[in-house]
UniProtKB/Swiss-Prot annotation:
Gene that this sequence comes from: ZP3
Sites of Pyrrolidone carboxylic acid modification: 23
Designated name of the protein: Zona pellucida sperm-binding protein 3
Extracellular side: 23-381
Compartment(s): Cell membrane
Coiled-coil boundaries: none
Record function comment: Component of the zona pellucida, an extracellular matrix surrounding oocytes which mediates sperm binding, induction of the acrosome reaction and prevents post-fertilization polyspermy. The zona pellucida is composed of 3 to 4 glycoproteins, ZP1, ZP2, ZP3, and ZP4. ZP3 is essential for zona matrix formation. May not have a sperm-binding activity by itself but may increase sperm-binding activity of ZPB.
Gene3D superfamilies xref list: Zona pellucida, ZP-C domain, Zona pellucida, ZP-N domain
Length: 421
């Protein structure tokens, strides 16, 4: 029997309810056993096009959505024509169509788009029975190896970035439980909570290294060049979010030189109905025996002492955080530059740093702009009748399957979504 994989799918309801449970997928000698509940969204990353199949019972409640309320990508591409009796809605678009974005990394081509459910009142009614929902979609195509058609194997990955460098350095950024003992399985928060973030580099057989968080920014989408944005870490390791009323800070001492932990008081952007946040950080490493300096540091602001203090190293390295003059232009100026694609860094430093993203962080209890008349405050009513998902989060696991060399790359990757787990 071939190995089995398990991944998590969460439906997050705007009213503060979360439906989340492990969804098993097995494979036995090439035969896939379907989960007990049919998936509501299926995605196929093919050689030149993207196929998205959506169940009309999108939220698993028995209330069917209208195909006209579904669209794909920023260009709002419409689905294929379907009959009223059809149980699914189907999209078939080219990888470059519908406003999809392409990101080129060192080892992959990443096409990103989203499925949107945007309900409109039916007829002369002024009420809505469902709310908006948005499903991020990504297709990853490896750049390495033979470029013939059968060599491309698209894969789904969870939107918790892990970056592999050429010298086998693996950078990661993860949400952790409050006691730091394990990774947080559900990215949901109430306003007033504190997010625990852990940046880490796995060095393998590399010489000992010390990890630093150079800068971090929070945005509403995975693209850190978008607006609005909020800077969390800047000036080569100054946790500037702690200057506000927040208590955000780096954790000292470190668990080890290759790990850096910090907390961020959760927030949402005013005047925006979305309740999701993505955090992107630029991570870098130095030799573990090098003394931290102004360009390589981890500094937190203490309101009680009204001063900056480092996780390690002399206190003088944090003085530049006060004026924001720590050697090079700040993050705010970097963000105004065009998005980086493949490489303006020199080959000497390409393995020393990486951009990693964690998200989305979901903030429960934030009122949606799309109200429902006649709603009640009962949690049961919110779950069953009126609090349908405005944001749908897919946590997707990378499944690497060995296929015969003659097989075409149009790998059919199924990502089930279910709200009834």
């Amino acid at each position: 029997m071939a190995p089995s994989w398990r991944f998590f799918v969460c439906f997050l309801l705007w009213g503060g309810t979360e439906l989340c449970s492990p969804q098993p997928v097995w494979q036995d000698e090439g035969q896939r056993l379907r989960p007990s509940k049919p998936p509501t969204v299926m995605v196929e990353c093919q050689e030149a096009q993207l196929v998205v199949i959506v169940s009309k019972d999108l939220f698993g409640t028995g209330k069917l959505i209208r195909p006209a309320d579904l669209s794909l990508g920023p260009a709002k591409c419409e689905p294929l024509v379907s009959q009223d009796t059809d149980a699914v809605v189907r999209f078939e678009v080219g990888l470059h169509e519908c406003g999809s974005s392409l990101q080129v990394t060192d080892d992959a081509l990443v096409y990103s788009t989203f499925l949107r459910h945007d309900p409109r009142p039916a007829g002369n009614l002024s009420i809505l029975r469902t709310n908006r929902a948005e499903v991020p979609i990504e297709c990853h195509y490896p750049r390495q190896g033979n470029v013939s058609s059968w060599a491309i194997l698209p894969t789904w990955v969870p939107f918790r970035t892990t970056v592999f460098s050429e010298e086998k350095l693996v950078f990661s950024l993860r949400l952790m439980e409050e006691n730091w003992s394990a990774e947080k399985m559900t990215p949901t928060f109430q306003l007033g909570d504190r997010a625990h973030l852990q940046a880490q580099v796995h060095t393998g057989s590399h010489v000992p290294l010390r990890l630093f968080v150079d800068h971090c920014v929070a945005t509403l989408t995975p693209d850190w060049n978008t607006s609005p944005s909020h800077t969390i870490v800047d000036f080569h390791g100054c946790l500037v979010d702690g200057l506000t009323e927040a208590s955000s800070a780096f954790k000292a001492p470190r668990p080890g030189p290759e790990t850096l932990q910090f907390t961020v008081d959760v927030f949402h952007f005013a005047n925006d109905s979305r309740n999701t946040i993505y955090i992107t950080c630029h991570l870098k490493v130095t030799p573990a025996d090098r003394v931290p300096d102004q360009l390589n540091k981890a500094c937190s602001f203490s309101k009680s002492s009204n001063r900056w203090s480092p996780v390690e190293g002399p206190a003088v390295i944090c003085r530049c955080c006060h004026k924001g003059q720590c050697g090079t232009p700040s993050l705010s100026r970097k963000l105004s530059m065009p998005k980086r694609q493949s490489a303006p860094r020199s080959r000497r430093h390409v393995t020393d740093e990486a951009d990693v993203t964690v998200g989305p962080l979901i903030f429960l209890g934030k009122t949606s702009d799309h109200g429902v008349e006649g709603s009640t405050s009962s949690p049961t009513s919110v779950m069953v009748g009126l609090g349908l998902a405005t944001v749908v989060t897919l946590t997707l696991a990378t499944i690497v399957l060995g296929v015969p060399r003659r097989r075409r790359a149009a790998a059919h990757l199924v990502c089930p979504v279910s709200a009834s787990q």
